[in-house]
Amino acid sequence: MTEVYANPAAGVYGRERSTSLAMRRGLMGCCPNCGEGRLFRAYLKVVDNCSVCGEELKHQRADDAPAYITILIVGHFVIAGVLAEDELYPTLNMALVGIVWSLAAVAASLALLPRIKGALIGFQWAARMHGFGGPEKEFV
């Protein structure tokens, strides 16, 4: 294998990593390197190493970004839904509407949060951020 610069500015050697593939794998909750191993050991707890390829995943620093992105996405749908419902059915009880849309927002947030965190971890891995620039594995 010939060495190429994956990131000339950072002086990182290795193969190019596909950002879209890594983000898709993370979105599905799989290792961004091999796509086989699990990314999470619990709801939002990331495994230290992939059980299949051994890629170290403890370097991830998703922090609060997945929550902000989730709020951005869910908020747009909930606000649009509330406004559309108010336009179409103006006589509905607003307390009931508030309860229903609040529950929908919580459910959508809980469903999206680990997927968005996985996609963000995949992006960090592909961009070799936060210590993900180590030696290449045989996968990918």
How would you label these PLM feature ranges?
Residues 2-6, 92-140:
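Cytosol/matrix-facing juxtamembrane amphipathic
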Residues 2-16:
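Short, Lys/Arg-rich, polar N-terminal cytosolic tail immediately upstream
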Residues 18-28, 39-45:
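Short, flexible, mixed-charge glycine/proline-rich loop motifs
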Residues 31-34, 50-53:
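Short cysteine-rich clusters marking metal-coordination/redox-active sites
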Residues 35-38, 57:
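Cys/His-rich microdomains that often coordinate metals
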Residues 60-61:
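Residues that scaffold, gate, or flank divalent-cation-dependent active/transport sites
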Residues 64-77:
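Select subsegments of transmembrane alpha-helices in polytopic membrane proteins
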Residues 75-97:
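Juxtamembrane "helix exit" motif at the C-terminal ends of alpha-helical transmembrane segments
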